[in-house]
Swiss-Prot record:
Similarity annotation: Belongs to the HflD family.
Gene that specifies this protein: hflD
Keyword Protease belongs to the record: no
Gene Ontology CC annotations of this record: cytoplasm; plasma membrane
Protein name according to UniProt: High frequency lysogenization protein HflD homolog
Keywords, comma-separated and alphabetical: Cell inner membrane, Cell membrane, Cytoplasm, Membrane
Length: 205
């Protein structure tokens, strides 16, 4: 994987998109199906030749690029996004230090890839299968991520499955962030550059 500003921006936008969808699903009970599918499909792309191949094209990350450039701020919505981002990246750091968990994750994703030949990725059972990977392997690694939203939606099992599947997609994005050389200093000192890059990409989406 190339270690460029472009690649870091794509990787970080992918995390932003997944956690933004978590927020939308928790608040509204649903979200755009195409964006959801692009997000969840990224989990199954395990041997890409370049960064953008994981998401198909830049347009599939439009929501993430918008979130990166406009919504990481001190507003209530922005603060919630930031909290999810910090939690997901902390979980990924725990995951990267656990070879056993990484092995289990790879095995479970291989099963999903085989199932994709027979089932639509957005089928309830497939989303449930992705959610169970998060619940079984990722969630035990660190403090539980507290997702806030409308209780009427969050009590629905289907919504819970979508949220967990999206958190798995967010962790996948955090793994990519590490693979393209993303470090904490890039978030502290290089965020302005990423925002500028995101705006350039949005202009051509």
């Amino acid at each position: 994987m190339a270690h460029t500003l472009y690649d870091r921006t794509i990787a970080f936008a992918s995390i932003c998109q997944a956690v933004k969808l978590v927020q939308l699903v928790a608040q509204n009970g649903n979200c755009d199906r195409e964006i959801l599918e692009a997000c969840l499909n990224s989990i199954t792309v395990t041997n890409p030749s370049n960064t953008i191949e994981i998401y198909g094209n830049e347009s599939n990350l439009r929501l993430g690029l918008e979130t990166l450039s406009q919504e990481i701020d001190s507003s209530p919505t922005g603060s919630e996004i930031t909290r999810y981002l910090v939690s997901v990246m902390a979980l990924e750091r725990k995951l990267s230090g656990r070879r056993d968990s990484m092995g289990q994750l790879g095995d479970r994703i291989d099963v999903i890839i085989r199932q994709k030949d027979h089932f639509d990725l957005l089928d309830d059972q497939m989303v449930s299968n992705l959610a169970s990977i998060y619940l079984d392997i990722i969630s035990p690694l660190g403090p539980r991520i507290q997702v806030t939203g409308a209780p009427a939606h969050l009590q629905q099992q289907q919504v819970q499955h979508k949220v967990r599947a999206l958190l798995l997609a967010a962790v996948r994005g955090a793994v990519l962030w590490r693979q393209v050389g993303g470090k904490r200093r890039h978030l502290i000192f290089g965020r302005k550059q990423m925002v500028e890059q995101a705006k350039i990409l949005l202009a051509r989406c």
